Structure formats: C-alpha cells, structure tokens
C-alpha cells in the first residue's frame, strides 16, 4: 500500500494499462479481462487486476495531466514492480490526414514542461516510446485493419491552451496530436528501466474542430485497448 494506491503487495501485475479516466479503467477491465478484481479505489482512482489470454494485467487510472500520472506511475514502478506501462487514452489530432477514431502510436512526446523537468535543467530531454512495444502495437493495428499513425505527439500541461502560435508550430513540424500525459510516462519509464507506450484514439480535431460525441467515445476505444493488450504480450 502506498499513499495513493491501496493495493496490497502482489495485487498489481507487471503489465499495467493506464487510461486517464478511472471509469474507463472499470469499463476496460470488465470488457477485456477475465475475473477482474478491484485493487484500488483510493481517492476514486480505480484499478483492476485480471487475466487476458492467460496473462495477468492491471488496468489503473492515471487521472488527467502529467502531475497526476506522475504520482501513479511512480508508485506503480517503484513500489509495485510494474515493468510495462501503456497509456490508453484520447487525443486531439493536429494533421489533416489524421481523422476521428484513428489510432496514434506515440513514438516521441514533446512538451514544454513535465514534473521531471527540474531534473534536466537546461537539457532538452527527448522522451520516447519503447521500440519493441511500438513495433508490436503497429503489427497488432495492421492486423485489425485499424487506421493508424506513428510519430511524434505533444503533451500539454494546459487543456484550454491559449497558444495558437505554438499549435501552428506543432502542425508545421508534423506533430500528430496533443494529449496531456505521455511525455512524463516515457520519462519515468526510462528512469525506472521499464517499457512504455502511448496508444491513443483521436477524439477531437484541432484543425477541423470535429469531435466525437460523448456516447461514441467509449465504443470507439475498443480497438485501442485490444492493440495495447496484444502489444504487451506479443
């Protein structure tokens, strides 16, 4: 048990999928895992452990933003011995050829700031995904026929960002999408010698201002979860 996770030793699997929304963690566990058991509900942040095709998996919420994810990822890696963390979540597309419901595999995650930025000081650290996970996820997505994009994303600390100039530069430099967690996830995984990947579904589009209706978001995320699970155990 840690300050923010109430799970007992051994309750957390070495492979953890991390949606931002704790209710999405519950939905994914009930839909994809056999015999899921709730292992954490401290502060309403739900975590479940169960089996998928004979493999033990935990699905645990991270909350919104890098400061929140940093708390849970640190404790999962440091105190519970997690070896593989895969973020499953939504993102906003920043390129014209990326469409709603497409899946994005984040090869790199640029950011202005993470909770780890004070460690690096003047160094412009470049967080990146684990290549083995990235390759496995790409193959899994290809097998499903899912529209998929691989490349850099941007992790923002601010949801309501009033920086149109920054967005323009992201688009100009080929950044695929914006979200709020992956840069810190990749940084922490590197520090703890673990594997990490962000598998994202496009729910909004910054260029066209399109957005998935709330009732479609959950049903559109099934491919993303299956890709993450297949990548983790390929």
UniProtKB/Swiss-Prot annotation:
Site, as annotated: Important for catalytic activity: 217
Keywords: Glycosyltransferase, Transferase
E.C. number(s) listed in UniProt: 2.4.2.1
One annotated GO molecular function: purine-nucleoside phosphorylase activity
GO biological process, one term: purine nucleoside catabolic process
GO cellular component: cytosol
Binding site for a purine D-ribonucleoside: 4, 162, 179-181, 203-204
Catalytic center residues: 204 (proton donor)
PROSITE patterns cross-referenced by the UniProt entry: PNP_UDP_1
Pfam family for this entry, one: PNP_UDP_1
InterPro entries in UniProt: DeoD-type, Nucleoside_phosphorylase_CS, Nucleoside_phosphorylase_d, Nucleoside_phosphorylase_sf
Disulphide-bonded residues: none
Positions with a binding annotation for phosphate: 20, 24, 43, 87-90
Catalytic activity as recorded in UniProt: a purine D-ribonucleoside + phosphate = a purine nucleobase + alpha-D-ribose 1-phosphate; a purine 2'-deoxy-D-ribonucleoside + phosphate = a purine nucleobase + 2-deoxy-alpha-D-ribose 1-phosphate
Stated role: Catalyzes the reversible phosphorolytic breakdown of the N-glycosidic bond in the beta-(deoxy)ribonucleoside molecules, with the formation of the corresponding free purine bases and pentose-1-phosphate.
HAMAP family: Pur_nucleosid_phosp
Homology family: Belongs to the PNP/UDP phosphorylase family.
Description of how the protein assembles with itself and partners: Homohexamer; trimer of homodimers.
Protein name per its UniProtKB record: Purine nucleoside phosphorylase DeoD-type
């Amino acid at each position: 048990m840690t300050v923010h996770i109430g799970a007992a030793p051994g309750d957390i699997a070495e492979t953890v999928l991390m949606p931002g929304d704790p209710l999405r963690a519950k939905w994914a566990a009930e839909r994809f895992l056999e015999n899921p058991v709730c292992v954490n509900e401290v502060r309403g942040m739900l975590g479940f452990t169960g089996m998928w095709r004979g493999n033990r998996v935990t699905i645990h919420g991270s909350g919104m933003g890098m400061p929140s994810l940093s708390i849970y990822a640190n404790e999962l890696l440091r105190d519970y011995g997690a070896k593989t963390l895969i973020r499953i979540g939504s993102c906003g597309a920043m390129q014209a050829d990326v469409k709603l419901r497409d899946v994005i595999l984040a090869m790199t995650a640029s950011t202005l700031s993470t909770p780890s930025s004070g460690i690096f000081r003047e160094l412009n650290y470049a967080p990146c995904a684990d290549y083995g996970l990235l390759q496995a996820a790409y193959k899994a997505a290809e097998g499903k026929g899912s529209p998929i994009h691989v490349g850099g994303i941007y992790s923002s600390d601010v949801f309501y960002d009033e920086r149109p100039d920054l967005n323009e530069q992201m688009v100009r430099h080929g950044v695929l999408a914006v979200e709020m967690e992956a840069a810190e996830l990749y940084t922490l995984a590197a520090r703890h010698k673990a594997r990490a990947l962000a598998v994202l579904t496009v729910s909004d589009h910054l260029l066209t201002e399109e957005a998935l209706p709330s009732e479609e978001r959950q049903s559109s995320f099934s491919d993303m979860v299956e890709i993450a699970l297949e990548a983790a155990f390929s």
